[in-house]
């Protein structure tokens, strides 16, 4: 049972990832709902060629690139024809061509007037379709990025999925009726709006469908959480493809027993497993032929809170970061229009990849361990839906290596460019994780966040406001009056104008009055600036987080350095800290915007107060007020 976690402190040091080990699965017919206690006397069997599999998966801690839509992105998909596809709330669909490294924009469609509510890509990667509440299905030729057909429906579609294998004569498409029990099969190339077959499969409307091409079987889930198998050819139960006759012999009632529903279904490339994500934040992995549970991963907030209190560094976060992410999770639970999370398999079917509160987890299903977590440091994005690219997904192409290049001393970089494509909560962007960390260009406009769409008018206005305010003259020193004495600080408005403006405006407005020094670590630093007094609160004068302002001349190279606390890159608010020793490991992570020039003894006095296990002083030490000279 894996989960996310939270940390207490607010933003200074970062921790390295560790792996939590759990027991292996023996074989398909013997289900294990894991992880459970390790069996005595048995050693965990490693996954053969594990490192080779991991080398074919993204590994960067931060997303390499992001590209814009005009509205919140809700769907992402990867085509075997080397295309990425994304859809958004405003009904727009974008095609992106995969290059040797990265992607390039190919085509933009206004697919529907309303939000895209379903996106499906065929197994061969040649066809794509979308549905919305406008009674229409749009079908696209992926390779030529052209809309080839439109099916007008007499009902509102609920789910859509392609149901044909490579080589089939007809490219069949299954569409469910959102308000009835029927599922309809269409031939988009026929030019007809009439289905070639229709059948009532469930006792309730179908909500989710996923095709297993290996067994030519559809797996579907209805609005009550009931799971059904049915043949894509006969629309009957596929007796020859499974090892059970009654669902009571399986775990397929697990979803309804847990009183939840189905968010998404994904099938492994070998057709032997499928995953189900649900609103209860549990990811369930089933064996296809037996319908038995293989794994259950609990990603609930209760487990996250328990792990935050544990000693597992892989799952712990700084307190302010943890609090912010918890607030986002609670907002996410109330947002019905948010993208439905899913859990995808890698090409070997040995690893499961899904987004969590903590980041994107890569789980080794064989050893039941966390292989890696991507994006843990990206505290501004809550990733939801993911799609995986690992090169030629059809497996038909063979990449030939020239003899001269087949040298063991040559580069070990993979021939493909494995990429995770994902969308995030309330974000207008698609994000890509690869095996490369983002570059740091000298020109900030050439950064990893590509502005391929014109920003909204309100965004342009807010940027203009910030820019104009930064041009005004700013104070170069302040005096902080505390319960233990006065601290005189020199500021650097030319090097970091936004940070100094934020700090001095808060000082003038009395924002910091009576704030506690809530975190004190002897031999490190003293921290304050949180109105809540626990490291989870505070905001900037603009009501949102603002970017870091690193300058090569301002480093954490001496004690009594004034620096901004944060929860990751570009997450500055109101909290700040004063170091009591040189802390060079914080360079380029926290914005240095001042130095203490008088009152060092006061800083040392605060540093020496007794604290509890959470570094909170037993005796309250407060900022009384801050004097800012008139500029």
Swiss-Prot record:
WD repeat start-end pairs: 68-106, 111-150, 201-240, 257-297
Source organism (scientific name): Arabidopsis thaliana
EC number: 5.2.1.8
Disulfide bridge positions per record: none
Annotated Gene Ontology cellular component terms: nucleus
PANTHER family xrefs: PEPTIDYL-PROLYL CIS-TRANS ISOMERASE-RELATED, PEPTIDYLPROLYL ISOMERASE DOMAIN AND WD REPEAT-CONTAINING PROTEIN 1
Top class in the EC scheme: isomerase
Induction (record text): Down-regulated by auxin treatment.
Every PPIase cyclophilin-type domain range: 474-628
Tissues with expression: Ubiquitous. Expressed in the meristems.
Record-linked InterPro entries: Cyclophilin-like_dom_sf, Cyclophilin-type_PPIase_dom, Cyclophilin_A-like, WD40/YVTN_repeat-like_dom_sf, WD40_repeat_dom_sf, WD40_rpt
GO terms under biological process: carpel development; chromatin remodeling; leaf formation; leaf shaping; leaf vascular tissue pattern formation; meristem structural organization; negative regulation of gene expression, epigenetic; regulation of flower development
Assembly and oligomerization: Interacts with FAS1 and LHP1. Interacts (via WD repeat domain) with histone H3.
Homology family: Belongs to the cyclophilin-type PPIase family.
Region (Disordered) residue spans: 26-45
Function: PPIases accelerate the folding of proteins. It catalyzes the cis-trans isomerization of proline imidic peptide bonds in oligopeptides. Histone proline isomerase that increases the rate of cis-trans isomerization of the synthetic histone H3 peptides H3P30 (RKSAP30F-p-nitroanilide) and H3P30K27me3 (RKme3-SAP30F-p-nitroanilide) in the histone H3 N-terminal tail, in vitro. Histone remodeling factor involved in chromatin-based gene silencing. Reinforces H3K27 methylation.
Protein name: Peptidyl-prolyl cis-trans isomerase CYP71
The UniProt record lists the keyword Nucleus: yes
């Amino acid at each position: 049972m894996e989960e996310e976690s939270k940390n207490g402190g607010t933003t200074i040091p970062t921790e390295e990832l560790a792996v939590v080990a759990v027991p292996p699965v023996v074989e398909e017919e013997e289900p294990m709902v894991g992880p459970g206690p390790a069996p005595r006397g048995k050693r965990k069997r490693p996954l053969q060629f594990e490192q080779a599999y991991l080398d074919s998966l993204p590994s960067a801690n931060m997303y390499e690139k992001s590209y814009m839509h005009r509205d919140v992105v809700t769907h992402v998909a990867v085509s075997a024809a080397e295309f990425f596809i994304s859809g958004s709330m405003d009904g727009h669909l974008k095609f992106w061509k995969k290059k040797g490294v990265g992607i390039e924009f190919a085509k933009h469609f206004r697919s529907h007037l309303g939000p895209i509510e379903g996106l499906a890509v065929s197994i061969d990667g040649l066809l794509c379709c979308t549905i919305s509440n406008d009674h229409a299905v749009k079908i696209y030729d992926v390779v030529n990025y052209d809309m080839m057909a439109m099916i007008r429906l007499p009902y509102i579609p609920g789910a859509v999925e392609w149901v044909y294998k490579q080589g089939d004569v007809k490219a069949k498409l299954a569409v469910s009726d959102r308000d009835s029990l029927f599922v309809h099969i269409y031939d988009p190339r026929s030019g007809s709006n009439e289905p070639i077959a229709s059948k009532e499969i469930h006792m309730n409307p179908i909500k989710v469908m996923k095709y297993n091409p290996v067994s030519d079987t559809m797996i579907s889930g209805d609005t009550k959480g009931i799971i059904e198998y049915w043949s894509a050819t006969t629309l009957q139960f596929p007796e020859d493809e499974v090892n059970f006759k009654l669902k009571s012999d399986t775990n397929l009632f697990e979803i309804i027993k847990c009183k939840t529903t189905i968010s998404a279904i994904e099938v492994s490339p070998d057709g032997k497993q499928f995953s189900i994500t649900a609103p209860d934040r549990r990811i369930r992995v089933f064996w296809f032929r037996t319908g038995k549970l293989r794994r259950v991963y609990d990603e609930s907030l209760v487990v996250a809170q328990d792990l935050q209190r544990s000693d597992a560094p892989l799952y712990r976060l700084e307190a302010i970061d943890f609090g912010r992410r918890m607030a986002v999770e609670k907002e996410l639970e109330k947002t019905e229009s948010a993208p439905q999370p899913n859990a995808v398999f890698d090409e070997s079917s040995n690893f499961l990849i899904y987004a969590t509160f903590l980041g994107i987890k890569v789980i080794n299903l064989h050893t039941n361990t966390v292989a890696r977590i991507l994006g843990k440091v990206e505290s501004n994005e809550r990733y939801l839906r993911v799609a995986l690219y690992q090169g030629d997904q059809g497996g038909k192409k063979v990449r030939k290596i020239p003899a001269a290049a087949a040298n063991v001393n040559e580069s070990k970089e993979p021939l493909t460019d494995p990429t995770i494509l994902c969308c995030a909560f309330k974000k207008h962007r698609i994000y890509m994780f690869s095996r490369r960390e983002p570059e740091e260009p000298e020109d900030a406009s050439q950064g990893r966040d590509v502005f391929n769409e014109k920003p909204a008018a309100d965004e342009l206005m807010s940027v203009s406001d910030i820019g104009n305010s930064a041009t005004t003259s700013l104070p170069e020193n302040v005096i902080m009056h505390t319960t233990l004495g006065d601290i005189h600080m020199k500021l650097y408005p030319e090097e970091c104008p936004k940070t100094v403006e934020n700090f001095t405006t808060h000082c003038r407005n009395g924002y910091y009055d009576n704030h506690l020094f809530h975190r004190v670590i002897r031999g490190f630093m003293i921290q304050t600036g949180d109105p809540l007094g626990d490291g989870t609160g505070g905001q900037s004068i603009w009501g949102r987080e603002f970017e870091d302002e690193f300058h090569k001349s301002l480093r954490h190279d001496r004690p009594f350095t004034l620096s901004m606390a944060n929860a990751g890159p570009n997450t500055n608010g109101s909290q700040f800290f004063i170091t009591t020793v040189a802390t060079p490991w914080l360079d380029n992570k926290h914005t240095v915007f001042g130095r203490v020039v008088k009152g060092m003894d006061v800083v040392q006095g605060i540093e020496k107060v007794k604290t509890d296990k959470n570094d909170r002083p037993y005796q309250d030490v407060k900022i009384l007020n801050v004097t800012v000279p008139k500029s």
